[in-house]
Amino acid sequence: MFPFFFALFFSSTDVLAASPSYNGLGLTPQMGWDNWNSFGCSVKEELLLGTAEKIVKLGLKDLGYNYIILDDCWSSGRSSNGSLLADDSKFPHGMKYVAEQLHNSQLKFGMYSSAGEYTCAGYAGSLGYEDMDAATFASWDVDYLKYDNCYNKGEFGTPEISYKRYKAMSDALNKTGRPIFYSLCNWGQDLTFYWGSAISNSWRMSGDVYPQFDRPDSRCPCSGDEYDCSYPGFHCSIMNILNKAAPMGQNAAPGGWNDLDMLEVGVGNMSDSEEVAHFSMWAIVKSPLIIGADIDDLKDSSLSVYSNPAVIAINQDVLGTPATRIWKYHVSDKDQYGEGEIQLWSGPLDNGDHVVALLNGGNNERSMNASWNDIFIDYLADSDELSNTWGLYDLWARRMSNATAASILSGNMTSAGLNYNVTQLNYTAGIARNDSRLFGDRVVELSKGESLTATVPGHGVALFRLRPE
């Protein structure tokens, strides 16, 4: 979240990135649900536990969505000894009870604070209280901390200053002895992608997302590839954030991930093609997959998007290499906001497979193609590492039907046996066993020197897994 009052200037210097997996957590991007984008400060015990129950019933937990993250506005301040207090009018049984209930459902409990005097909504922040607050979170059996950047008392302006402020909580969490996933939410300020992996498991890299595919907004002033944005803002569109993330993939790896912010699938009024593109692109760049929607008000088509194991398997691939944007071109069929571009993204996967996305940000459906040399741009044309023939699998071809999703949402059909269950067979093992649910449909064979061609809807994507044959 973005502060209400924020200094406008800072300078930056380079900081060397450290090795990933600083605490052994986050070897694949985190998945789960956070209440903020749909509920804001309207939080209470029933919301968290009711949502958790629904996530289990809908089969989302089985797919890997296992963190239930309580965002801002949960606190009633500090006790006489300085420790954080939960608001007992919202959480009458206390936070340890919430954690226990989630753990009983094989889910994990996430909480929120800010590296400032106050949180973004004006509640007690953790700046200067890091050791005490980390100990409190650990005593509540918390598994995850989202750590924001509001009211930071001007402690920013260079990577070193921001690093030290966020490292204080990192060290405090580690002192507790409890494994706690550490998620930075400092909006990419002070080049977080250079130093985030040294002290955390993920880091936001832009201003806050909102559910618009590419609508410009003055509150998100940086655009294009302006990854080093001095005023990150908020109300950033899907394409705005994706373009900022394009050069940052080289800084992500198992243990530390670029966080493009919560998923807006099921939030607002994006089209189905836009939601598919949003989910696909977050998945292939290895962003965390954190649902931001109201699970009780989820559309059938949105549940279908969230429930695609073939796409999730790309995100959870243990190689952990984000796809790279190979090219971007502006097109003439611009939308109502004057925006329109097409892109090719490509990247390697753990078992020798490859992922390719043709992204159509234009207003109209179009035929798009990618050359062999573009897809495999990181290999020499005659490389022995490359197979001469690849099977091409459409990762959305076996998407759950809207009718099935509607039946699951209504309770007329159980998700048991329909969804992939990562608790029984993880994605790596499923790929090794050629589980068809993780591949979609084989649509064509791609031979050396040929181009991949697909028809892509406006504001949509064609997403493929390539397998050497």
From Swiss-Prot:
Q: Which InterPro entries match?
A: Aldolase_TIM (IPR013785), Glyco_hydro_27 (IPR002241), Glyco_hydro_27/36_CS (IPR000111), Glyco_hydro_b (IPR013780), Glyco_hydro_melibiase (IPR006215), Glycoside_hydrolase_SF (IPR017853), Melibiase_C (IPR041233)
List positions binding substrate. D71, D72, K146, R204, Q250
Q: Where is the signal peptide?
A: 1-17
Major subcellular location class: secreted
Pfam families linked: Melibiase_2, Melibiase_C
Q: What is its EC number?
A: 3.2.1.22
Question: What positions does UniProt annotate as the active site of this protein?
Answer: D148, D208
Family assignment from sequence similarity: Belongs to the glycosyl hydrolase 27 family.
Q: What is this protein called?
A: Alpha-galactosidase
